[in-house]
């Protein structure tokens, strides 16, 4: 709360200790539903794949490479130029781009009548305008998503009517079948490097050191724990007259060492792709301590992480490139799986999709899903709730029957006297579960006493909901007293006995937590004998 510094200085000069102690009155008391852990400061989190991409970009830049964006859409003739006799095998793994053809639509007398029936009397001039727009669409002068707005504009009718007219009068648009083009989505970054380097030589001279971290597409038979149909490749090239295989080894070590890899092993790749010079295509195996003992086939710490080679002159010559080029590439997702301890590439990439990811909520997240249902809406109501809790804390062990005044004043325009009571004999003001606190522990949400038995559960403050049964009940009692004051009642009594479910102690569990707890076969346990009552007497 805001305060007057000058007043504080004056008061402190007169009585420092009193002013210091009263400082706590200037700090607003949060409502039950505002208490930590429900009051949080959220922060953004990078996706693990994009986080790894950024780290790779920074690593390449530190090594002196310049970033380049390569063509993503590649004509299949480029693949033939680059891969030679292997082109068909490569293209079998490529996605071809297809598009809908643009039909040649005629407007007969019958269709003219249908158009006028839907759009109204637009006259022969209106029909001619439609014919001209459709002709322009066929010629490619108007894009498909502009067709309806264009007709709407020239005729001065609504988009909805035009869309309805096209749907009913011109069925050709609904019968269109996509036609494949010769354009493909690149399956290797190599497809783009040849095009980029060939074009660059017209304006610059080597040596070149470039890198690109971007998306590739591969038509896999199916996606599984280790492969996706779309992935990110972190690729680099060095174009220099003196480039050798050793440059590939040096780049491998320089790049991967920045990610915690410690030892390297280079083996000839058995694939022998035709776009590499024979015997230069090399697999890079690297040792990472995080893999040691992992529940994977890489538990010895070694993993195949990258491939490099020297581009073949037979492929480079197709682009008039006269200089040797070393190319290295690695899959970003595989590196991200290591850095983020992910066992499945699908769950790493798409954690939001249930079929790929085991749902896990921490105890702290579950605790944030616990709320008090009915809460007072006035400052007087909040004061009543606080006074009820205070009296229960002071006199909870008092034998019954007993009654303790807790608050007196005006609420909602009426004077009221509030007391905590227990009319029954041979018991206490509060039952043994009154001061149970709501805690999330090992996936369960429970109302438990803060005793030695539950010490482990209470050690994690972020998993404590910050709500005791008596506080939730007091909030309900205060809210009902507000409502009773407005209704004109002369007396109102609120009782709680043995709680069996959250609602009986005025608690509400968020639907997400309920689904999680049920799905995990965990429990929500808010049972216990609370046994107390609150009486409000209106004057």
Curated annotation (Swiss-Prot):
GO MF assignments: ATP binding; phosphoserine-tRNA(Cys) ligase activity; tRNA binding
First-level EC class: ligase
Keyword set, alphabetical order: Aminoacyl-tRNA synthetase, ATP-binding, Ligase, Nucleotide-binding, Protein biosynthesis
Superkingdom of this protein's organism: Archaea
Listed EC numbers: 6.1.1.27
Paired cysteines (S-S): none
Keyword set includes Metal-binding: no
UniProt: substrate binding residues: 188-190, 233-235, 275-276, 327
Entry keyword annotation includes Magnesium: no
Catalytic activity: tRNA(Cys) + O-phospho-L-serine + ATP = O-phospho-L-seryl-tRNA(Cys) + AMP + diphosphate
Gene Ontology biological process: translation; tRNA aminoacylation
Role according to the record: Catalyzes the attachment of O-phosphoserine (Sep) to tRNA(Cys).
Assembly and binders: Homotetramer. Interacts with SepCysS.
Protein family: Belongs to the class-II aminoacyl-tRNA synthetase family. O-phosphoseryl-tRNA(Cys) synthetase subfamily.
Protein name (record): O-phosphoserine--tRNA(Cys) ligase
Organism expressing this protein natively: Methanosarcina barkeri (strain Fusaro / DSM 804)
Phylogenetic classification of the source organism: Archaea, Methanobacteriati, Methanobacteriota, Stenosarchaea group, Methanomicrobia
